[in-house]
């Protein structure tokens, strides 16, 4: 019996260590934000707001450029949070909103209005394809927002899942 318990504990700790190694940390989140804003400047985008959330939907970092409008932080968080909540990039959520508005409306009610069904919310996947977080960007057109997110993630060797 003690060997079985020790084995189970060892398996748990190995899994927990693997989870921590694949978790999104502050340094990486700040790099994602920095790179996304740099891409936005290269594209001459309107002032952007970038939010990075961990896999549990918790905000790690948020940056809002000078000139970004009032609700941009909530929109960026809503794009990233929606991607995490539904397990797909917000481009697919936007398509769902067009094809199944009652469903997305119901989900948004359950989410207390936190879901933003527009491109710019991109899942962040590790090398094994597991979701480790999401980035949400807003400020320019949804296509530009999404392009900044994808480029930032790819520049760091992360897998971007925009739902395309």
Stretches with model-predicted labels:
Residues 2-3, 74:
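Intrinsically disordered, low-complexity regions enriched in Ser/Pro/Gly/Gln/His and often acidic
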Residues 3-20:
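Short, Lys/Arg-enriched N-terminal segments with co-localized hydrophobic residues
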Residues 19-164:
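Flexible, solvent-exposed loop/hinge segments and secondary-structure transition points
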